[in-house]
Curated annotation (Swiss-Prot):
This protein's UniProt keywords: Cell cycle, Cell division, Cell shape, Coiled coil, Cytoplasm
Location of this chain's protein in the cell: Cytoplasm
Gene: gpsB
PANTHER family linked: CELL CYCLE PROTEIN GPSB, CELL DIVISION PROTEIN DIVIVA
HAMAP family: GpsB
Record-linked InterPro entries: Cell_cycle_GpsB (IPR011229), DivIVA_domain (IPR019933), DivIVA_fam (IPR007793)
Biological-process GO terms, alphabetical: cell division; peptidoglycan-based cell wall biogenesis; regulation of cell shape
Homology family: Belongs to the GpsB family.
Organism field: Bacillus cereus (strain ATCC 14579 / DSM 31 / CCUG 7414 / JCM 2152 / NBRC 15305 / NCIMB 9373 / NCTC 2599 / NRRL B-3711)
Protein name: Cell cycle protein GpsB
Amino acid sequence: MISDKIKLTAKDILEKEFKTGMRGYQQEEVDKFLDMIIKDYEAFHKEFEQLKQQNARLKRELEEQKLAVTQVPQQPVQTPVAQPVYNNTNTDILKRLSNLEKAVFGSKLYE
């Protein structure tokens, strides 16, 4: 992620104070700080370019999907043919069978 690569914030740059030596700022300290700034800007630029490429790719894919959707021929939706509805479930059938057995064989089955 980009925040992992960036070491400085705008506030860090604004508030950075360099120690002054006998003849002004310590050149090594300024150079190190500027090197960090350069690395941050390079990281920003690289991330920005990657995001631009990703954005362009996603826009192309979106346009392709839109085109594919508009080119699909519109077919009428067929409603399924109504199947005969049987209200007899397995439990109903078992109850009826049990009642028939009782009627035919009487209580002999259950002794």
